[in-house]
Amino acid sequence: MVTPDKNSNGIKTVDLRTPLSSEDVLALKAGDLVSISGNLITGRDKIHKYLTEQKPDKKDIPFDLSGAVLYHCGPLIKKTEDGYKIISAGPTTSMRLEMYEASVIKEYNLKGIIGKGGMGEKTLNALKENACVYFQAIGGAGVYLADRIKTVLGVWKIDEFGPAEAMWSLEAEGFPAIVTMDAHGNDIHRKIENMSSKKFSELIGQKT
């Protein structure tokens, strides 16, 4: 669900609630500020490798990934009497998952990816083909982002992969991010890289 809003500074923020639909995703454009509430599912290297290579039956995965937002995050977790508490939940570098992401998006009908640093051409094409979107989270703000996680709903593969690499189901409220790769083929990361390369070439040319 998408709800446009403005914060106290007059900056437009799109309020999103998971699960997302294709219509929700197609309404988003690169550069949009978003606030995400609802279920977030974490997944790092081992989860992506497992989903891609082992191809588990969807009924064997305890969380519904259709319409889900997958967060590239290995949270720092504290075990409590009642369950688990998130101590830190910052994004990990997304490009390390480039080899897996396109197939995971298609196979499990993901509608959002949260991470850091953007992804490659293969993932960008998968975003367009499957109406999915990439959100850039705030790097270096793990404790701040953990405060946006209100509840740990469950965990999968913790014994096999360990806490950082397990798949966590988290209930978020007002999780901030920016759309940097949209379902229309726009990629802010690539745009900035191209602009930087052009500027660098100009500077080198001035010195020679």
Q: Could you say what each language-model-derived stretch is?
A:
Residues 101-103, 179-208:
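Active-site/ligand-binding-proximal alpha/beta "capping" segment
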